[in-house]
Swiss-Prot record:
HAMAP family named in the record: MscL
The organism's place on the tree of life at top rank: Bacteria
The protein's role, per its UniProt record: Channel that opens in response to stretch forces in the membrane lipid bilayer. May participate in the regulation of osmotic pressure changes within the cell.
Gene Ontology CC: one annotated term: plasma membrane
Any one Gene Ontology molecular-function term assigned to this protein's record: mechanosensitive monoatomic ion channel activity
Name of the protein in its database record: Large-conductance mechanosensitive channel
Quaternary structure annotation from Swiss-Prot or TrEMBL: Homopentamer.
Family: Belongs to the MscL family.
Membrane association type: Multi-pass membrane protein
PANTHER family in UniProt: LARGE-CONDUCTANCE MECHANOSENSITIVE CHANNEL, MECHANOSENSITIVE CHANNEL MSCL
Pfam family, one: MscL
Segments crossing the lipid bilayer: 10-30, 76-96
Name of the gene this protein is made from: mscL
Taxonomic path: Bacteria, Pseudomonadati, Pseudomonadota, Gammaproteobacteria, Pasteurellales
UniProt organism field: Haemophilus influenzae (strain PittGG)
Compartments where located: Cell inner membrane
């Protein structure tokens, strides 16, 4: 029972719950960005590059033989994934900038001046 109680306390801490929510939202956001890239950006890029479909861009290393499929390097899909990453990284960067701007800056505690410290020390010594 002690193990379950410890796990429950760990799982219900604010940071763990926040992280779990972030992972879920991030996963959904990743799917949206992937769709944006594959369904909107790459077709437009294909038109601009002469009708090239990025999904079909690949190097054939070994031709298909019978039931064995061809061995290919799918660099077109890799390009799509790089575009996905760049968009997601940029969106996260912008969100962090906004969060940091909105977050209340912590007030810096200024160290007392030397004169103030000396005065306090003098007063403490007088009281002894």
């Amino acid at each position: 029972m002690n193990f379950i109680k410890e796990f429950r306390e760990f799982a219900m801490r604010g940071n763990v719950v926040d992280m779990a929510i972030g992972v879920i939202i991030g996963s959904a956001f990743g799917k949206i960005v992937s769709s944006l890239v594959s369904d909107i950006f790459t077709p437009v890029l294909g038109i601009l590059t002469g009708g090239i479909d990025f999904k079909d861009m690949k190097f054939v290393l070994a031709q298909a033989q019978g039931d064995v499929p061809a061995v290919t390097l799918n660099y077109g899909l890799f390009i799509q994934n790089v575009i996905d990453f760049i968009i997601i990284a940029f969106a996260i960067f912008m969100m962090i900038k906004v969060i940091n701007k909105v977050r209340k800056p912590e007030e810096k505690k200024t160290a007392p001046k030397a004169e103030t410290l000396l005065t306090e020390i003098r007063d403490l010594l007088k009281n002894k």
